[in-house]
């Protein structure tokens, strides 16, 4: 056998040349103690605040407390499989989630993983969950309406694109129903509206029952509204860090639309539960407690989240992110810590009351206490024309109704005011899942403020409204089109609307 030294040395040299020098260096630490979803880790000296770290078995966590001798890590998932002495690896990445149109129609958890069984999400972009809100220069004041389809809100407490409007009330007063109707109301624009008007919806469920979230998704799906919505769910059985993270994750998904010149609406349901889970994490991390045992930065938790909802100026693409945070009160106590915090952060609030709900006034909006700090800037001119007087009349009605309980002999003017107020209150009622287009709301409220309901018994107001709307849709669609395109009630339209009301009122009686 002939051994050629030159050939062998050539092969060896070749192999040496191709020898890989890459060795993966990862910074690791050791678990000192673990319990209640919190791990104390030794090592990881260069870890960043908010960085994702990895435990054995693929469980992830987020470094929140950076102390002199250890790192406090909150665990996204079960801590049962983590034990003392386990190796913890740095990922080098701050917590981020997938964003983009690929998420529309899907249900994801707080880290953006799909939980609806419809396969993986092929999103190409990712975004950090906790980024700084836009400054003052890139913003523009709110001036376009964000129609919810609810007469009581669109007429009296209008919400604009880029606004933060708080929905606050006790349990079972219809807070989620308002969010759901606002989502369903966008269907008409998505089906045949211009691209620039479309409003994409993000619903963040925090600490709710899985059955409740499933019901919400089912309603959206049945009514064709899931295709433009993203659902982020951190349910009651999920660990506290997931419930804390979910609103930030949903916000990052909504910001994608805002920053690309589109419009998005995000509902946080509800932020009281996020504050509770943040309190749990903070106390377990041994941060000092403050009022009601919440940590000192619970105001900052909500303010940095809600400040990210904004209307951008034209140079930034003129997109917007509108936020509808929900807060649940205990026994109508709006002066508790978290409710007062969020009221002071938002641009107005919609108060829902149990008493009104049980009186059959639904949506149970207390029109006297609810405000929108953007106001009529977020309404089209037609709505301003009819809704301006309804506010004043309802305010007078509430004042008179309080006095009328004592006096029996009322003069004719007071009696007229009370009658009108009762009928307008009846007019603002609306069944669930039946949002109205803005032009239809305008027509109905026009009838109310111009005295067409005054002669009707209060019980027939709803029937009159339904009848008049179907009459307009069949006979007077030109009137509705005129209000929609002109965005105002011209003298010509006013004449036609009055004529239509006269002819319908004759046939109705």
UniProtKB/Swiss-Prot annotation:
CDD domains per record: ATP-synt_F1_alpha_C, ATP-synt_F1_alpha_N, F1-ATPase_alpha_CD
This protein's encoding gene: atpA
Site (Required for activity): 370
Pfam families: ATP-synt_ab, ATP-synt_ab_C, ATP-synt_ab_N
UniProt organism field: Rhizobium johnstonii (strain DSM 114642 / LMG 32736 / 3841) (Rhizobium leguminosarum bv. viciae)
Annotated ATP binding sites: 169-176
Protein name (Swiss-Prot/TrEMBL): ATP synthase subunit alpha
Entry similarity comment: Belongs to the ATPase alpha/beta chains family.
Reactions that this protein is recorded to catalyse: ATP + H2O + 4 H(+)(in) = ADP + phosphate + 5 H(+)(out)
ATP-binding is among the record's keywords: yes
A GO molecular function held by the record: ADP binding
EC numbers on record: 7.1.2.2
Compartmental location: Cell inner membrane
Keyword Membrane attributed: yes
Assembly behavior: F-type ATPases have 2 components, CF(1) - the catalytic core - and CF(0) - the membrane proton channel. CF(1) has five subunits: alpha(3), beta(3), gamma(1), delta(1), epsilon(1). CF(0) has three main subunits: a(1), b(2) and c(9-12). The alpha and beta chains form an alternating ring which encloses part of the gamma chain. CF(1) is attached to CF(0) by a central stalk formed by the gamma and epsilon chains, while a peripheral stalk is formed by the delta and b chains.
Physiological role: Produces ATP from ADP in the presence of a proton gradient across the membrane. The alpha chain is a regulatory subunit.
GO cellular component: a single term: plasma membrane
Keywords tagged on the record: ATP synthesis, ATP-binding, Cell inner membrane, Cell membrane, CF(1), Hydrogen ion transport, Ion transport, Membrane, Nucleotide-binding, Translocase, Transport
HAMAP family, sorted: ATP_synth_alpha_bact
């Amino acid at each position: 056998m002939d051994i050629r030294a030159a050939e062998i040395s050539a092969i060896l040299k070749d192999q040496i040349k191709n020898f890989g020098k890459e060795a993966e260096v990862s910074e690791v630490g050791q678990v000192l103690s673990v319990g209640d979803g919190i791990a104390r880790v030794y090592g990881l000296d260069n870890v960043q605040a908010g960085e994702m770290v990895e435990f054995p078995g693929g469980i992830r966590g987020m470094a929140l407390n950076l102390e002199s001798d250890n790192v406090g890590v909150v665990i996204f998932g079960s801590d049962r499989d983590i034990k003392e002495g386990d190796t913890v690896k740095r990922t080098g990445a701050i917590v981020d989630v997938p964003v983009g149109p690929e998420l529309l129609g899907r249900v994801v958890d707080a880290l953006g993983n799909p939980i609806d069984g419809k396969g993986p999400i092929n999103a190409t972009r990712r975004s950090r969950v906790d980024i700084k809100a836009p400054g003052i220069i890139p913003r523009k004041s709110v001036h376009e309406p964000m129609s919810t389809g609810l007469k009581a809100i669109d007429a009296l407490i209008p919400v604009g694109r880029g606004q933060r409007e708080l929905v606050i009330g006790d349990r079972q007063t219809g807070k989620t129903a308002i969010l759901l109707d606002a989502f369903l109301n966008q269907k008409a624009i998505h089906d045949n509206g211009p691209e620039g008007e479309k409003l994409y919806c993000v619903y963040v469920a925090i600490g709710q029952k899985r059955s409740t979230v499933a019901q919400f998704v089912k309603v959206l799906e049945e009514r064709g509204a899931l295709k433009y919505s993203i659902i982020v769910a951190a349910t009651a059985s999920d660990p506290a860090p997931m419930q804390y993270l979910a609103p930030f994750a949903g916000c990052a998904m909504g910001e994608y639309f805002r920053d690309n010149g589109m419009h998005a609406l995000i509902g946080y349901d509800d932020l009281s539960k996020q504050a509770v889970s943040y309190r749990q994490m903070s106390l377990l991390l041994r941060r000092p407690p403050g009022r009601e045992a919440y940590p000192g930065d619970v105001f900052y938790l909500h303010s940095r989240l809600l400040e990210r909802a904004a209307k951008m100026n034209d140079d930034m693409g003129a997109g917007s992110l509108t936020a509808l945070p929900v807060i649940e009160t205990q026994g109508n106590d709006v002066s508790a810590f978290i409710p007062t915090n969020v009221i002071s952060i938002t641009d107005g609030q919609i108060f829902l009351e149990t008493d009104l709900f049980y009186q059959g006034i639904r949506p149970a909006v207390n029109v006297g206490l609810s405000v929108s700090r953007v106001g009529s800037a977020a309404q089209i001119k037609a709505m301003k024309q009819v809704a301006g007087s309804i506010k004043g009349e309802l305010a007078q009605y509430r004042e008179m109704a309080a006095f009328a309980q004592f006096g029996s002999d009322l003069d004719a003017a007071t009696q007229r005011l009370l009658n009108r107020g009762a009928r307008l209150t009846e007019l603002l009622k609306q069944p669930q899942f039946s949002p109205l287009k803005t032009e239809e709301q305008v027509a109905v409220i026009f009838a109310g403020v111009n005295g067409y309901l005054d002669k009707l018994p209060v019980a027939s107001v709803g029937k009159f409204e339904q009848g008049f709307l179907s009459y307009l849709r069949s006979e007077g669609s030109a009137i509705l089109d005129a209000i929609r395109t002109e965005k105002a009630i011209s003298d010509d339209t006013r004449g036609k609307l009055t004529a239509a009301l006269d002819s319908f009122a004759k046939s109705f009686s």
